[in-house]
Amino acid sequence: MEQQHGILVLNKPKGLSSAQCVARVKRLGQKKIGHAGTLDPMATGVLLVLLGNATKLSGYLLEGGVKTYGGTLRLGVTTDTWDAEGSIVSETALSEDDLARGSALEQAARREVEAWLDVTEQPVPPYSAAKHQGQPLYKLARAGKEVPVKVKSIHVSHASVQWVNMPDVRFRVTCSSGSYIRSLAHSLGIRLGCGATLTELTREYSHPFGLDVAHTLDEILAEPERLPEWIMPISAALPGWKNISVGKVQEAHLKNGMPVPHLPEFGTFESGERALILAQDGSPLALAEARMDRERPVWAVLRGLFTH
């Protein structure tokens, strides 16, 4: 199959890493391929697979892109990875009173989930791809070396409890890109004093795509000839960006890395605004940003997207 260009919204299965999923799609003749927003092997749900010129979108898709997750955490258990994939570090025996419906512990857990709305910083899990002096933290952890505590800024815009079946708490959370849900679960366990670990996680939405447009890996591998019809165009991945169609002269400028002067037919112009530049046939040419060049409004190339 020839190289495709665009975004394949994959419903990642449990047990495979994001890289393993990408490798399987790559076997369908897709040499230029990548993904935006890694999911841990135990997690399922929306994984954006970038094909062809869409591989250049990765940083822009993650920029300010919110994600929604549905997950389950278990009270009374702590693991070294902060999720069910790890080894148990400690267990707290919960009493019958703790496990009773409507118990004080259940009510406290509900409050703590809702308190995620106030979280602005979180510790990075020791078993993660975050780096310290060029070394991934998980490599330090696996080698038994001391893992430095790293903290990252996050934003949570929604947090709610879906159901409770003690000691399991089902939740939904919408947060900024790069947030660690297992860190939220781990910190909740610390605050409650009984420990907690993430046991299940599904990414339901990764801006701007949800599970409603996702395809399973089995579906894709079973009917590879349908891959072209399942691919979302680059314009669909950048809903907040202006679309600008240019003529042959401007297209030549773009392909040489030159800025395109703003024209009235492009619509409004605001410095710092970003746009997807399209050829007359609708094919993507570049990602561009509105700038002033010697008092002249231009669209400067951020990334070229043309394929020839």
Identify what each model region corresponds to.
Residues M1-S183, S187-V213, L287:
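RNA pseudouridine synthases
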Residues M1-V46, T72, R191, G195-H308:
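Accessory RNA 3′-end/elbow-binding domains used by RNA modification enzymes
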